[in-house]
Curated annotation (Swiss-Prot):
GO terms for cellular component: viral capsid. This is Minor capsid protein P6. One of the minor capsid proteins that constitute a network internal to the major capsid proteins and outside the lipid membrane. The minor capsid proteins glue and stabilize the capsomers. It comes from Paramecium bursaria Chlorella virus 1 (PBCV-1). The keyword Membrane does not apply.
């Protein structure tokens, strides 16, 4: 019985190691050729690799006017060699100031006569990974303050910082902006109202969205 108990404990330990090892990784941004079955709204169709390829997530018909404006600041095209030959990125540690700087760098692009005036508040969620080409992949949810409308607003950012420190933005939108029934960006409340909208990280559940590509 003792041997059986030891064997069971060993098996549990092995399963635990495999589980957490899998959890340490997240998906390459923009690498997949086929649309994801569980998220058909995303299209990763690639153009010939000797040209630039489609990079930014498509803007859905249900997007709010706010998100249509934000989508202008994504990178619609990226060099073919940006992720060509890139490996699955390994999770990497990050500092608060690092992800704050990436968020502020993306936010600095939001300019124009019809663009909102947004001030950075804080990062709520972040994930970071590095591939074999030294590209750094970021997935960040952060809060901003709309100075004109007096709103606090949650934004999502999916971006790649290449080896030359150029930031390529794949997704930049209000939180849960892809929901058809939205009348306005979710995660938005008057700054005087508390608490803020509950944070539900459905846009970063890579284990669910990309489970069919787990071995890519």
């Amino acid at each position: 019985m003792i041997l059986v108990g030891i064997a069971v404990l060993i098996l549990l330990a092995v399963f635990a190691i495999l589980y957490y090892k899998q959890k340490e990784k997240f998906v390459v941004v923009g690498k997949f050729v086929e649309p994801i079955p569980s998220n058909p709204g995303q299209d990763f169709t690639l153009l010939p690799m000797d040209q630039t390829y489609t990079f930014a997530d498509p803007v859905p018909d249900t997007a709010t006017a706010f998100d249509v404006v934000l989508s202008r600041f994504t990178d619609k095209k990226a060099p073919a060699d940006l992720l060509k030959g890139a490996t699955f990125p390994e999770a990497a540690p990050y500092t608060d100031s690092e992800v704050e700087n990436i968020s502020k760098l993306a936010l600095s692009r939001v300019k124009g006569p019809d663009a909102p005036v947004l001030s950075f508040i804080s990062v709520e969620y972040a994930a970071k990974g590095v591939d074999n080409k030294k590209n750094t992949h970021y997935d960040i949810a952060f809060m901003v303050y709309d100075q004109v409308k007096n709103f606090s607003l949650k934004l999502v950012l999916v971006a790649v910082l290449d080896a030359k420190n150029k930031l390529w933005i794949k997704k930049f939108s209000s939180f849960n902006s892809f929901t058809p029934k939205d009348k306005g960006p979710k995660g938005v409340e008057n700054i005087d109202e508390t608490p803020l909208a509950e944070f539900i990280p459905d846009f970063v559940q890579f284990s669910r969205l990309y489970k069919d590509n787990a071995n890519v």
